[in-house]
């Protein structure tokens, strides 16, 4: 008897394009959300677009967050309850969106994602990443009811944020390899459809990296669509597996041990070079990944990340301890092997 079932939660509306920030109110109205929202943002996005957003919601209050933490989630929950908010609208990059996602889940209300930078696929996924001390927690939550991404605003975001978003997507290539490996060796649940969507999205950016240029709104359009596809793949899978493998463990370990960690997307991009070599050896696709990252202006070396070689090696040899997720790292890569991989690929 077949008894398998799945529950796929996806955004109901996705609106991408030039000037669509002014359509947030309309998009929310189409969702039939009653009442008044609480707007969640951080200082820079608020200065950039907060007034345009507030103009679409009479009487909506705003909470501004400075740091990502579980305490900040609690503050948003308290502010929403005090204001009688019936849903949340998050404006900004990863921080406000991740925090609003968790707060909405705790409140049992919906939320709308309004990204101002194409920095990572959390703008559409059902996962939040929240630091606590030297640990970063990946927390499951419902995805946004709607995503409204204004490519004009995103094209004017710091270019490093866009290249980080590109690198985050490109790293899906190795994340899917880890997922398939875990299915074969550990019998983890696997979705061929989610894996194919994630892999196709990564390959699309690798193949078109030369066309992604600073200042081009078309580049923000391409990257935004890729981030949406990656987030949808995670929703279909019901986990972050399609977009998070050993390269993410490597990045999370860098967050813990590096004196000045780089952007998340940049770290997973470099991690993807290393883990692709571990998967496929010197004739694998690590050069294609490296060349794509170079084409968009993302880091490909420890020096370009601003992290010393020793810390990169330590992160690679200890990344498997971050969480109980089987990847190509297995029970750990020894120091000699890590140095060989990082040296051969030019990371150090």
Task: Label the model's feature ranges.
Residues 1-87:
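ATP/NTP phosphate-donor binding region
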Residues 6-8, 31-32, 81-83, 104, ...:
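Solvent-exposed alpha-helices and their adjacent loops that cap or buttress functional pockets
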């Amino acid at each position: 008897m077949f008894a398998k079932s799945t529950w796929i939660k996806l955004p109901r509306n996705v609106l991408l394009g030039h000037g669509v920030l002014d359509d947030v109110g309309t998009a929310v109205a189409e969702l039939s959300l009653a009442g008044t929202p609480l707007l969640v943002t951080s200082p820079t996005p608020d200065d950039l677009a907060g007034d345009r957003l507030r103009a679409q919601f009479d009487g909506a209050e705003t909470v501004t967050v400075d740091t990502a933490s579980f305490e900040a989630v609690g503050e948003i929950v308290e502010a929403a309850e005090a204001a009688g908010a019936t849903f949340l609208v998050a404006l900004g990059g990863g921080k406000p969106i991740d925090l609003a996602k968790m707060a909405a889940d705790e409140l049992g209300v919906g939320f709308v994602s309004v990204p101002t930078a194409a920095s990572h696929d959390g703008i559409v996924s059902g996962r939040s990443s929240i630091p606590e001390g030297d640990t970063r927690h990946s927390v499951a939550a419902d995805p946004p009811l709607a995503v409204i991404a204004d490519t004009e605003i995103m094209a004017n975001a710091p270019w490093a944020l866009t290249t980080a978003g590109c690198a985050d997507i490109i790293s899906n290539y190795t994340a899917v390899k880890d997922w398939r490996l875990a299915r074969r060796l550990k019998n983890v649940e696997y979705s061929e459809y989610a894996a194919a969507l994630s892999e196709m999205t990564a390959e699309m950016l690798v193949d078109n990296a030369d066309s992604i240029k600073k200042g081009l709104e078309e580049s923000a359009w391409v990257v935004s669509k890729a981030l949406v596809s990656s987030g949808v793949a995670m929703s279909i899978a019901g986990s972050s597996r399609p977009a998070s493998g050993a390269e993410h463990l490597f990045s999370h370990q860098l967050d813990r041990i590096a004196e000045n960690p780089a952007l998340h997307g940049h770290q997973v991009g470099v991690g993807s070079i290393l883990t692709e070599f571990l998967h496929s050896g010197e004739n694998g696709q690590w050069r294609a990944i490296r060349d794509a990252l170079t084409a968009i202006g993302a880091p490909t070396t420890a020096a370009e990340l601003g992290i010393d070689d020793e810390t990169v090696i330590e992160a690679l040899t200890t990344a498997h301890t971050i969480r109980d997720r089987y990847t190509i790292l297995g029970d750990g890569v020894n120091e000699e092997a890590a140095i060989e991989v990082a040296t051969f690929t030019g990371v150090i």
